[in-house]
């Protein structure tokens, strides 16, 4: 029976351990580590962050104990696509009134947002919140925190992700960098009347 490792086996084991040690002492998610580097508009009072891929893994590990909440407008949810397990409770609705200063259509806040979330989630439940790219979901996390929810994560890259920022690229301005839809994880256009 062989009990000693050869020099080559020892070296290989040392390399493997050197690669694994940083993973053991690192924060639990990349997104948590990057939290301080997030744009202010994507930061939340709870400070709980996940990427879309991390969020999907967290949901897969406990589908009955983790709720995915999509706070985009109903139109975005239906026509751009959505995570199949996501509940849609819009943080706001589109007003279709042009805001010349912001160069965008306006939004009307959803006054029933908290009450609608409480219909399927409790204040201590784990909730993973997404919007298009992380801005509205950060606002939603903060609103939920103010209402007493304590385990609410911000999906920092949202459903569509961040835009490509390369003027030389034909994809400049398109949301192709990250996000649920671009991460190779399940999404659909099919509505679920229960959600």
Predicted regions and their residues:
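Rhodanese-like catalytic fold shared by cysteine-dependent sulfurtransferases
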Residues: 2, 27-64, 78-126, 137-195
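Bacterial N-terminal signal peptides that target proteins for export
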Residues: 2-15
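Compositionally biased non-globular segments, especially hydrophobic aliphatic-rich helices
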Residues: 6-9, 21, 29
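Bacterial N-terminal signal peptides
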Residues: 12-25
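Short hydrophobic beta-strand that contains or immediately precedes a catalytic carboxylate
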Residues: 67-72
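Short, surface-exposed ligand- or partner-binding patches at beta-edge/loop junctions that are enriched
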Residues: 129-131
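Conserved G/P- and acidic residue-centered "switch" motifs that form tight phosphate/ATP-binding loops
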Residues: 134
């Amino acid at each position: 029976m062989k009990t000693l490792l050869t020099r080559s086996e020892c070296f290989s084991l040392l390399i493997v351990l050197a690669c694994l040690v940083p993973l053991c002492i690192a924060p639990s998610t990349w997104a948590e580590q990057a939290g301080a580097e997030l744009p202010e508009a994507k930061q939340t009072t709870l400070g709980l962050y996940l990427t879309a891929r991390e969020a999907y893994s967290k949901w897969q590990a406990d589908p009955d104990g983790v709720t995915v909440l999509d706070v985009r407008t109903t139109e975005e949810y239906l026509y751009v696509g959505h995570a199949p397990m996501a509940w849609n409770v819009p943080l706001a609705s589109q007003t279709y009134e042009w805001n010349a200063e912001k160069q965008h259509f306006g939004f009307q806040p959803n006054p029933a947002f908290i009450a609608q979330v409480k219909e399927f989630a409790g204040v201590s439940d784990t909730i993973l919140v997404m919007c298009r790219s992380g801005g509205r979901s950060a606002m939603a996390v903060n609103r939920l925190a103010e209402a007493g929810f304590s385990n609410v994560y911000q999906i920092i890259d949202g459903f569509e992700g961040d835009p490509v920022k390369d003027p030389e690229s034909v994809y400049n301005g398109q949301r192709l960098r990250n996000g649920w839809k671009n991460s190779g994880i399940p999404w659909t256009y099919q509505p679920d009347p229960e959600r």
